[in-house]
């Protein structure tokens, strides 16, 4: 037995905002998704587990839409949190802090080959481009994605609350 190393991206920063997240797509391919801290880059690498266990070169994607940028005018890419839901025909969702400095979601119905435009799903009104909720995600892998989030950064919110919602079958529930 031997151990083989595979470099995801030669410029990957040593920053917890950029940590790669891994998910097995419904077709057996392993996806690695990651960002660079507060840049405009979201990367996807693919590993076909039936081959030589080497990740293919990084694919750069830009999931935001001009329409969302008009509504939420700030663009940074930080965090990548992918989840696959079996009961949604293996749809892969990816969450992160992107358009508007807010939690966004996008999805893929073809094992990560193509992606929807991202959508902001948590924001404040009136919109404040400096406010950024902190979010944690968890999924059962079947039908539900659990989401816990705050009003904003702990140092910026004098009364910072914690909220819980879950996503299931096309809707959010509290």
Task: Annotate each language-model stretch with its function.
Residues 1-174:
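Extracellular, repeat-based ectodomains that mediate carbohydrate processing or recognition
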